[in-house]
């Protein structure tokens, strides 16, 4: 957990530094991200710290495309700067594609993601705001114990996530798909929120 906090702290320092250097909206240079896009700042920051990048073939960011649970694990591994290359064998889920096994394995080994309880991860399922927030909040040190979920997974995530600002500008629906723009926004919200400190 200490290493995750260190990685998040370093990423946050990078974000703060970049925040001072961003000249104006649209600097990310994605042709499909308008200057007035609600998530343009988050997209720029996440691109600059190499957490989320655009489509190599088209040069687009695709801010309105839904994100899968597998893609969210990639975002989390990049956000936390996990050395994912060594974690392919740590992925216990049979439905995760070969290319993504190191990312999901690294997140699983660091208690950021969990599966559905039937041996699957739901690799191609769209991620919801509550699921994504749970991953972000575990990385921040929340939900380390089963009693943290005593009111149920969704209730606990929405309550704590709302309190620390994870859902700001996104909403906390448990049943809608998140877009790439919203994931960027939530990641930036997480980087700007408080981490749990244990004494």
Regions found by a protein language model. Name each.
Residues 2-40, 52-102, 110-131, 136-177, ...:
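Feature responds to low-complexity, polar/acidic, surface-exposed segments characteristic
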Residues 182, 187-191:
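Extracellular, beta-strand-rich glycan-interacting domains
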Residues 49:
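Conserved dinucleotide-binding and phosphotransfer motif residues
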Residues 45-46, 107:
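PEST-like intrinsically disordered low-complexity regions enriched in serine, proline, threonine
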């Amino acid at each position: 957990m200490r290493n995750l906090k260190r990685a998040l702290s370093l990423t946050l320092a990078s974000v703060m530094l970049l925040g001072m250097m961003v000249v104006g909206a649209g600097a990310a240079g994605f042709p499909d991200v308008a200057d007035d896009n609600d998530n343009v700042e988050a997209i720029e920051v996440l691109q600059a710290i190499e957490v989320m990048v655009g489509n190599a073939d088209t040069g687009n960011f695709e801010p309105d495309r839904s994100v899968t649970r597998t893609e969210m694990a990639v975002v989390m591994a990049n956000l936390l700067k996990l050395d994912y290359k060594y974690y392919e064998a740590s992925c216990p889920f049979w439905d995760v594609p070969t290319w993504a096994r190191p990312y999901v394995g690294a997140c699983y080994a660091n208690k950021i993601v969990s599966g559905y309880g039937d041996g699957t991860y739901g690799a191609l399922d769209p991620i919801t705001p509550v699921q994504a927030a749970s991953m972000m909040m575990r990385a921040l040190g929340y939900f380390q114990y089963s009693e943290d979920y005593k009111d149920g997974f969704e209730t606990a995530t929405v309550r704590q996530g709302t309190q620390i600002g994870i859902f700001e500008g996104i909403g906390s629906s448990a049943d809608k798909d998140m877009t790439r723009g919203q994931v960027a926004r939530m990641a930036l919200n997480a980087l700007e929120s408080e981490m749990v400190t244990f004494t």
